[in-house]
């Protein structure tokens, strides 16, 4: 009986099961799923926060920590060459498209990290950047200022540098979307033009802030979709090298 047992044992294969039976290949990830975290080598920081909450200070700190970082803000569109800030809500959508174009160019050139310094109240406002990140293999990192007053309307009205009134900041706070994720941003839907116009009107600065009244008052660099000197320009806190 012992000999029979040894013969049966000898016929058993000690090879791993995967060599006896061919394994099925793993299923591909669902379409629109970003690569696994370990595969990311480039980073996109999407800053969020109400006016005066400390976004620009946070952007500068990130740039200090990552000297190669580039900061892109839609606000840059409304800075004149002499450094004066003049806001025109009629060109807000164009300004966002202009900023997205700069960010896309930087991503295609492999710049990392890239920092988007915008209010980004709604998930859909960040969607173009999330799509770019997916297409160019960037990890998206959402950051908000960690200031104690970031939702204190009275303090925000006092601190913001563009003259946004307390009432408008209060309305912005009411619409602020919390707990956004990459997937919620990627699948967010852009609202109708009517709702966007309402948001645009709520973004108007207070009466003591300067703004352009007509397209003809824009500097030529704006009319042609960019700065006169495309090679380099300065903004608050850094140089963007033409992006």
Swiss-Prot record:
Keyword field contains Cytoplasm: no
Induction notes from the record: Up-regulated by USF1. Up-regulated by FOXO1.
Region annotation Disordered: where it falls in the sequence: 1-38
Family annotation (Gene3D superfamilies): P-loop containing nucleotide triphosphate hydrolases (3.40.50.300)
Origin superkingdom: Eukaryota
Xref: InterPro entries: NEDD4-bd_p2 (IPR026302), P-loop_NTPase (IPR027417)
The keyword Zinc-finger belongs to this UniProt entry's keyword annotation: no
Keywords: Developmental protein
PANTHER family (UniProt xref): NEDD4-BINDING PROTEIN 2-LIKE 1
Assembly mode: Interacts with dynactin subunit proteins, including DCTN4, DCTN5 and DCTN5.
Biological function: Might play a role in adipocyte differentiation and triglyceride accumulation.
Name recorded for this polypeptide: NEDD4-binding protein 2-like 1
Species assigned in the record: Homo sapiens
């Amino acid at each position: 009986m012992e000999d029979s047992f040894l013969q049966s044992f000898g016929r058993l294969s000690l090879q791993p099961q995967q060599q006896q039976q061919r394994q099925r290949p793993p299923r591909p990830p669902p379409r629109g799923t970003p690569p696994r975290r370990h595969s990311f080598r480039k980073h996109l920081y999407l800053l969020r926060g109400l006016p005066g909450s400390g976004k620009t200070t946070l952007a500068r700190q990130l740039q200090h920590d990552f000297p190669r970082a580039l900061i892109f803000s839609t606000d840059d569109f409304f800075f004149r060459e002499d450094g004066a800030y003049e806001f025109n809500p009629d060109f807000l959508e164009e300004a966002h498209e202009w900023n997205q174009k700069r960010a896309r160019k930087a991503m295609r050139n492999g710049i990392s990290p890239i920092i988007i310094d915008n209010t980004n109240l709604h998930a859909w406002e960040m969607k173009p950047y999330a799509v770019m990140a997916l297409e160019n293999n960037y990890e998206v990192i959402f950051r908000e200022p960690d200031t104690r007053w970031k939702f204190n309307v009275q303090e925000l009205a006092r601190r913001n540098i563009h003259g946004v009134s307390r009432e408008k900041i209060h309305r912005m706070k009411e619409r602020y979307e919390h707990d956004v994720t990459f997937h919620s941003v990627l699948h967010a839907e852009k609202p109708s033009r009517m709702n966007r116009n309402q948001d645009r009107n709520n973004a108007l600065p207070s009466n003591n802030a300067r703004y352009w009244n007509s397209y003809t008052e824009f500097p030529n660099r704006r009319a042609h979709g960019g700065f006169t000197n495309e090679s380099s320009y300065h903004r608050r806190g850094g140089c963007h090298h033409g992006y």
